[in-house]
């Protein structure tokens, strides 16, 4: 999304890696496991100090990186029962909001303090969904949690579900029909097809659209962004 927003729609984008695995940070070769990352600084101190926002190789896209120090930061926040725990990213991002058109937060699947902070700070949530039983079960739980967090952030909404890694089969098609008709959530028309060389793209440290622009998945992502932007974003 960040790449398309910057290159096609000329938007200024802040990418926020909120996953301790740091996959987005690794993609842009900005992962450093030896220092406290920008996401950790924001979670602990409620600010993005100079140096915590880094330039990526994509003009118009900056990054707040992450690593396994995030786990230590979360434990520290949990232990602090005197200070508010859920408004930390909101305060940090508010200070730089004028510099960007979009902030995209990449979250892990678990709903820890860092993810709650991200939802409190955001306007909308896009849920990527694989069409398997575990993902669909987790989807219902996540949707319920987002609704609960509205007590802390009344503006937040689930913008929609994006079907990813799609491989055609009777079971997958049945699951997609259920998702679109029975889940009660908006599902984007465009789904993202499975790309067998996706792992190769991560090794090359390139986005799928840069690694193989002609692949079905790359074209699907561009079509999804067009659909998303038509929604008035």
Predicted regions mapped to residue ranges:
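P-loop NTP-binding core
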Residues: 1-233
């Amino acid at each position: 999304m960040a790449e398309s927003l910057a290159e096609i729609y000329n938007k200024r984008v802040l990418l926020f890696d909120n996953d301790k695995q740091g996959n987005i940070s690794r993609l842009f070769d900005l992962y450093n496991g030896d220092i406290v990352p920008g996401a950790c600084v924001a979670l602990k101190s409620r600010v993005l100090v100079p140096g915590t926002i880094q330039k990526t190789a994509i003009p118009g896209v900056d990054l707040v990186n992450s690593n396994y120090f995030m786990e230590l930061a979360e434990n520290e926040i949990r232990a602090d029962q005197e200070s508010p725990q859920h408004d930390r990213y909101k305060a940090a991002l508010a200070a730089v909001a004028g510099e960007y058109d979009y902030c995209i937060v990449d979250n892990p699947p678990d709903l820890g303090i860092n993810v709650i902070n991200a939802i409190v700070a955001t306007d909308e949530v896009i849920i990527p969904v694989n069409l398997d039983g575990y993902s669909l079960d987790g989807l219902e739980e996540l949707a319920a949690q987002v609704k609960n967090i509205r007590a802390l952030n009344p503006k937040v909404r689930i913008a929609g579900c994006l079907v990813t890694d799609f491989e055609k089969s009777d079971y997958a098609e049945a699951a997609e029909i259920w998702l679109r008709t029975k889940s009660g959530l908006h599902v984007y028309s465009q789904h993202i097809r499975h790309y067998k060389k996706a792992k190769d793209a991560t090794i090359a440290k390139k986005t799928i659209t840069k690694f193989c622009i002609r692949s079905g998945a790359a074209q699907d992502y561009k079509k999804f962004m067009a659909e998303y932007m038509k929604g008035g974003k």
